[in-house]
């Protein structure tokens, strides 16, 4: 059985943050990430620290953030113990990299990725640990070839870890990034997994490395293809309207957002995923046979790619 190595995970996650920021800056060609390093002393709630990095007003990206955090607490919040009651009364550590990129151009999809590690410990008992993460894509004006490329890259990431891993984590992603009150998925999905500890520690760790590094391989070629596509006010207005769904999901359903807010996490870092602008419109209906209608008809429901 492989040894649990928290320090190795932390070091890797910090390197992954550096690597992803570098590649996104290269793709943007103008903006750089501004780092806000933070630290909290342990107290009644979360202690720890992190590096919040935000990019604004680039050539390609209107706003985006790539966060690293490593926090500790004496008791898990309700959002975590609700489905894992055995965690009650254990001190815990949580560390991860989380990112969201909101592009200017409506033809470039919004993207999200996350890899994380949790460990909950109690004197005299075996630790409870798991990994989680994934990446998902939210296009406004989807192209079939882009969606297939995204999912084919996800399949390649999963292939070394088992024949059924992609299918399982793709289905989990479709289920997780779903807005019941809207009856639609947030986007076209990708990969999502949580509570990953059924393999040995080293294999689980290798999998989150593959997912973390696979994100840029899946996303940047799509950005490169679409970032110079011409668009007008109509496309921009629709992009802002659809960003509203992103806000709704993150504030109502997202487990990471709820965990962070309920456990007293750093609010500015938690809400970094919010788009800089979004809009809502009462009783919006896309025009029949329009590109906007195509999004609803063909892409906001689970599909096999």
Swiss-Prot record:
Q: Where does the chain bind substrate?
A: 98, 114-116, 264-266
Output the Gene Ontology terms for molecular function. coproporphyrinogen oxidase activity; metal ion binding; protein homodimerization activity
**If you read the UniProt record, what top EC class would you report for this enzyme, in one word?**
oxidoreductase
UniProt xrefs under PROSITE patterns? COPROGEN_OXIDASE
UniProt cross-references to Pfam families, sorted A to Z: Coprogen_oxidas
Name its pathway. Porphyrin-containing compound metabolism; protoporphyrin-IX biosynthesis; protoporphyrinogen-IX from coproporphyrinogen-III (O2 route): step 1/1
Which catalytic reaction applies to this protein?
Answer: coproporphyrinogen III + O2 + 2 H(+) = protoporphyrinogen IX + 2 CO2 + 2 H2O
Q: How does it assemble?
A: Homodimer.
Which protein is depicted?
A: Oxygen-dependent coproporphyrinogen-III oxidase
């Amino acid at each position: 059985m492989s040894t649990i190595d928290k320090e190795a995970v932390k070091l890797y996650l910090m390197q992954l943050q550096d690597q992803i920021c570098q590649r996104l800056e290269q793709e943007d060609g103008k903006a750089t990430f501004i780092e806000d390093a933070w630290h909290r002393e342990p107290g009644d709630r979360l202690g720890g620290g992190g590096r919040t990095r935000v990019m604004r007003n680039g050539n390609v990206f209107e706003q985006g953030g790539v966060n690293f955090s490593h926090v500790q607490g004496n008791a898990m919040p309700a959002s975590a113990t609700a489905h894992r009651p055995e965690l009650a009364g254990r001190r815990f550590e949580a560390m991860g990299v989380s990112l969201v990129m909101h592009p200017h151009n409506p033809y470039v999809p919004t993207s999200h990725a996350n890899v994380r590690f949790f460990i909950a410990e109690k004197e005299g008992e075996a630790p409870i640990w798991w990994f989680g993460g994934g990446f998902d894509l939210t296009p406004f004006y989807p192209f079939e070839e882009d969606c297939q490329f995204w999912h084919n890259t996800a399949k390649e990431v999963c292939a070394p870890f088992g024949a059924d891993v992609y299918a399982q984590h793709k289905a989990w992603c479709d289920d997780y990034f779903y807005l019941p009150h809207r009856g639609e998925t947030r986007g076209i999905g990708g990969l999502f997994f949580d509570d990953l500890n059924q393999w040995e520690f080293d294999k689980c760790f290798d999998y989150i490395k593959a997912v973390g590094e696979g994100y840029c391989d899946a996303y940047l070629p799509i950005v490169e293809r679409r970032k110079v596509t011409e668009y007008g006010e109509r496309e921009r207005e629709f992009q802002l309207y659809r960003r509203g769904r992103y806000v709704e999901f993150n504030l109502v359903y997202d487990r990471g957002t709820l965990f962070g807010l309920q456990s007293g996490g750093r609010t500015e870092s938690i809400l970094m995923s919010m788009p800089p602008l979004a809009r809502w419109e009462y009783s919006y209906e896309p025009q029949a046979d329009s590109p906007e209608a195509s999004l609803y008809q063909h892409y906001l429901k689970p599909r096999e790619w």
